[in-house]
């Protein structure tokens, strides 16, 4: 089983399939959309088969490993593998992208180009989670941005060029830090290598780690996103189509969280111990600032975009908790938000197709004409506000308890952070339920409610939301369904991070001010 190049096949299948789209005879786009859906389903089936047949849940290290020399002159290798960090996100990518392809059914403008770019994104996103060569990681990270930019700039709204340009400038600017920090890691010391495992084993001075950590944090903070590097996201979501929404919220934001885990925590553990309080503070700012900003938004897309930023704050706090429970909760929050964010933004697209407005002031009373849509909006919003029995509740609870019980911070710091996290949790249902009240209940916009195009959701849309709600509820009632995949890897990562805390005080001779939030290690470090 392990001798077959599963990951390479999974990455290349949608990319190679995309190359055949230009020669498919198709005038109205119907053939090419069925072709793209078939490719997505086959690739997702391969992901599931490779997972069940060749992935050992008890093994924390890399599996399904492949390594082929690509450019021997610079020792660049096509090196891919999957562990507990990458496998859940590879599965999520296949699942969300396949549903996003179904969500793209209404696209009639240049359908061949659209589905061509969708398949390129599919392969590129999986590659980001699978590659184990840091230079190759940078290349696929950059190449994956091109389809996103084109989809935003061609199929977006009135300000699509502004949003697409802002997206590419932010992300490309951040990528420069990936390149500089990655090359520094590769060429530091006696051994020059791009292999991530070999880089993680290097003995890198703490001061250099701090500099590289800051560079990676800026780059991945753009994609997560982290305040104040977040401003591209509301603009991008404000102009994107439904399938682009699903990919942005469901997958692209997770690339930032994954990279923070893989590189900042995994490769630079000493620096992570110093930056951890900073991550906690940034996480709290994300939660509170974005929640208040979301509450003030009148544009439906921007309201949910800021909600996404708020939820990503829990990821940062979980990563900095130094506990198995907290970091596991951060990973679960990424997966949970991928599902919930995709469902909410799909509903935004479905609603806009009928109302042709995004302003909440103009949407009153549409629930009476969209009975099934009413139920779907309610279910997705309840999932987003972390209703017990849904995945968001479990993820946020794990982060809460994991951070509250962390022995890496003093009691005062933990108490303040937990209280502020609680404020964010309270704000979430306020702005989400008020959104539902304005949009679905009233006061009625008679012109809109009586419009002939305001029809209920169709079976295709019900199916897409149903597919997203099944894992949301399934994880909510049985979190082990997902946590068992990544817990061995997360536990190993946490132990590495915890062991690094005392080494900072001894090796870097940091001042008390720099470690004021971190107290000396106790038993278990």
From Swiss-Prot:
Q: Which reaction does it catalyse?
A: a plastoquinone + NADH + (n+1) H(+)(in) = a plastoquinol + NAD(+) + n H(+)(out); a plastoquinone + NADPH + (n+1) H(+)(in) = a plastoquinol + NADP(+) + n H(+)(out)
- Where does it localize? Cellular thylakoid membrane
E.C. number(s) listed in UniProt:
7.1.1.-
Q: Entry's InterPro entries? A: NADH_Q_OxRdtase_chain4 (IPR022997), NADH_Q_OxRdtase_chainM/4 (IPR010227), NADH_UbQ_OxRdtase (IPR003918), ND/Mrp_TM (IPR001750)
| Keyword hit for Cell cycle | no
Alphabetically sorted, this entry's keywords are: Membrane, NAD, NADP, Plastoquinone, Quinone, Thylakoid, Translocase, Transmembrane, Transmembrane helix
UniProt GO molecular function: NADH dehydrogenase (ubiquinone) activity; ubiquinone binding
Its main localization is membrane
* Sequence intervals crossing the membrane: 4-24, 37-57, 89-109, 111-131, 134-154, 167-187, 210-230, 241-261, 273-293, 309-329, 330-350, 385-405, 416-436, 462-482
Q: Which PANTHER family match?
A: NAD(P)H-QUINONE OXIDOREDUCTASE CHAIN 4, CHLOROPLASTIC, NADH-UBIQUINONE OXIDOREDUCTASE CHAIN 4
Q: What does this protein do?
A: NDH-1 shuttles electrons from NAD(P)H, via FMN and iron-sulfur (Fe-S) centers, to quinones in the respiratory chain. The immediate electron acceptor for the enzyme in this species is believed to be plastoquinone. Couples the redox reaction to proton translocation (for every two electrons transferred, four hydrogen ions are translocated across the cytoplasmic membrane), and thus conserves the redox energy in a proton gradient.
- Of which family is this protein a member? Belongs to the complex I subunit 4 family.
Protein name per UniProt: NAD(P)H-quinone oxidoreductase chain 4-1
């Amino acid at each position: 089983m392990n001798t077959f190049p599963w990951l390479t096949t999974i990455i290349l299948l949608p990319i190679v399939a995309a190359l055949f789209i230009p020669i498919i005879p198709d005038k109205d786009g119907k053939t090419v959309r069925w072709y793209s859906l078939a490719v997505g389903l086959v690739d997702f089936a391969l992901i599931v088969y490779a997972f069940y047949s060749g992935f050992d849940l008890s093994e924390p290290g890399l599996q399904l490993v492949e390594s082929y020399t690509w450019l021997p002159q610079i020792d660049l290798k096509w090196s891919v593998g999957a562990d507990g960090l990458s496998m859940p996100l590879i599965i999520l990518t296949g699942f969300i992208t396949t549903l996003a392809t179904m969500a793209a059914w209404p696209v009639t403008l240049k359908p061949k180009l659209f589905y061509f770019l969708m398949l390129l994104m599919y392969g590129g996103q999986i590659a980001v989670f699978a590659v184990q060569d840091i230079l190759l990681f940078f290349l696929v990270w950059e190449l994956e941005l091109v389809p996103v930019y084109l989809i935003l700039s061609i199929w977006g709204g009135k300000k699509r060029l502004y949003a697409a340009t802002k997206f590419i400038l932010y992300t490309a600017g951040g990528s420069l830090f990936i390149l500089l920090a990655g090359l520094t890691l590769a060429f530091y010391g006696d051994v020059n290598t791009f292999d991530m495992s070999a880089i993680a084993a290097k003995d890198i001075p703490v001061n250099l780690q701090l500099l590289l950590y800051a560079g990676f944090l800026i780059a991945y903070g753009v994609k997560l996103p982290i305040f104040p590097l977040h401003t591209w996201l509301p603009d991008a979501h404000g102009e994107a189509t439904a399938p682009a929404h699903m990919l942005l919220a469901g997958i692209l934001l997770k690339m930032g969280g994954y990279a923070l885990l893989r590189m900042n925590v995994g490769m630079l553990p000493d620096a992570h111990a110093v930056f951890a309080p900073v991550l906690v503070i940034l996480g709290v700012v994300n939660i509170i600032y974005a929640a208040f900003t979301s509450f003030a938004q009148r544009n439906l897309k921007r309201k949910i975009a800021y909600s996404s930023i708020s939820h990503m704050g829990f990821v940062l706090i979980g990563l900095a908790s130094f506990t198995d429970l907290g970091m596991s909760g951060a990973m679960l929050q990424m997966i949970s938000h991928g599902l919930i964010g995709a469902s909410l933004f799909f509903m935004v697209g479905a609603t806009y197709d009928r109302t042709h407005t995004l302003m909440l002031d103009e949407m009153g009373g549409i629930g009476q004409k969209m009975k099934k849509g009413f139920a779907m909006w309610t279910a997705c919003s309840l999932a987003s506000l972390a209703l017990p029995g849904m995945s968001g509740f479990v993820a946020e609870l794990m982060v809460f308890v994991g951070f509250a019980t962390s022995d890496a911070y003093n009691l005062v710091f933990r108490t303040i952070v937990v209280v502020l996290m609680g404020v964010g949790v309270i704000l979430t249902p306020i702005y989400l339920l008020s959104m539902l009240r304005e949009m679905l209940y009233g006061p009625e916009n008679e012109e809109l409610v009586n419009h002939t195009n305001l029809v209920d959701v169709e079976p295709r849309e019900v199916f897409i939301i149903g597919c997203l709600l099944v894992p949301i509820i399934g994880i909510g009632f049985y979190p082990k369904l997902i946590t068992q995949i990544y817990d061995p890897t997360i536990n190993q990562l946490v132990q590495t991070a915890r062991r690094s805390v005392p080494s900072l005080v001894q090796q870097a001779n940091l001042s008390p001010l720099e470690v004021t939030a971190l107290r000396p290690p106790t038993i278990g470090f």
